[in-house]
Curated annotation (Swiss-Prot):
Keywords: Antibiotic, Antimicrobial, Bacteriocin, Plasmid, Secreted. This is Halocin-S8. It comes from Haloarchaeon S8a. Has antibacterial activity against the haloarchaeons H.salinarium NRC817, Halobacterium GRB and H.gibbonsii. It comes from the Archaea. The gene is halS8.
């Protein structure tokens, strides 16, 4: 990031510097949008909207209104460069992360059908823009969830503490994620339909690989990462949401500790968003963070080297 893109105003650094957030990877602090001046907020907006990821969204989905309305939260590194941000936009929320590879996610606050797609009712749509391109994804219906989970080894689903499914309707790719709290294991399956004439999933328990064409299977065991967490404030359920949101592909094994985020449900929501950019889980996390908890993480990412090499 060039100097002109740095969020390096003294007031920003004074307000959020020295907090000690994830110093192993250079994070210097986090601030709520309310604590920034108008000029500082504009600096954040300018940096995000000059990014290639936002341009990709505008080019492919010109009808989506991502005009910025409010800066909700910001993190910077020690040089003042923008690391993560969450903004309210006209059509929902926009999440920006430049930790490893810059990622922009737009989570709509309305149903998918309202943006011109003939998708089932009660599904939610979101855009994910990365170096690999731009995808418009949606959450699964109850019937699709049933079909997918029945097509996967029954014991795997029954043993999971939580399962999440979302879909790329254009490529008919289904993604399933499940988390085992006891063994601290997160698994992600990238699946495809079995080539049925209707395009509808028709899984069988006997031959899930044939029906699903499992393209990729990732397993992440957080217990093996030797994570150490410390907190200086009392954390109520879900209050660490904006601290962990958007730390895409970095240290999620530590940031998503059940102790940190207040229990199994918000922990899974955290893991799905943070690790794999799955913002349909955001609804499980409160929008606001108690300012007193901005100082809650001291030593976070001892797993940094193993995490980056794993992915």
């Amino acid at each position: 990031m060039s100097d002109k893109d740095s969020i390096n105003r003294r007031n920003v650094l004074r307000k959020i510097g020295g907090i000690g957030v994830a110093s192993a990877v250079g994070f210097s602090g986090l601030a709520s949008g309310e604590s920034l001046s108008d000029d500082e907020k504009q600096d954040v907006i300018d940096t995000i909207y000059k990014s290639q990821r936002v341009e990709q969204i505008k080019k492919k989905f010109g009808g989506v209104n991502i005009e910025p309305k409010k800066v909700q939260s910001v993190t910077t590194n020690q040089s003042g460069d923008l690391v993560t941000a969450k903004l309210s936009v006209s059509d929902g929320d926009l999440v920006y992360s430049s930790v490893k590879d810059t990622t922009v996610i737009v989570q709509f606050d309305r149903s998918a059908s309202e943006i011109g797609e003939s998708w089932p009712k009660n599904t939610e749509a979101f855009i994910k823009s990365t170096s690999s391109g731009v995808d418009l994804l949606r959450t699964a219906t109850d019937e699709e969830i049933k079909d997918v989970t029945e097509g996967v080894n029954t014991s795997e689903i029954e043993s999971a503490d939580a399962v999440n499914i979302f879909i790329d309707p254009e490529s008919q790719t289904y993604y399933m994620e499940k988390y085992d709290f006891n063994n601290k294991v997160l698994e992600m399956f990238e699946l495809a339909t079995g080539g049925t004439s209707s395009g509808k999933i028709s899984p069988t328990r006997e031959d899930q690989n044939h029906e699903y064409n499992v393209r990729e299977h990732k397993v992440f065991n957080s217990e093996k990462q030797n994570i150490q967490l410390q907190s200086d404030c009392n954390i109520n359920s879900n209050t660490a949401a904006d601290v962990i949101l958007c730390f895409n592909q970095v240290g999620s094994c530590a940031l998503c500790s059940p102790t940190l985020v207040g229990g199994p449900v918000p922990t899974v929501a955290c893991l799905l968003v943070v690790c794999f950019g799955t913002p349909n889980a955001v609804s499980a996390i409160l929008e606001e963070v108690d300012n007193s908890c901005f100082n809650l993480i001291k030593d976070v990412i001892s797993c940094w080297d193993e995490w980056t090499s794993f992915w």
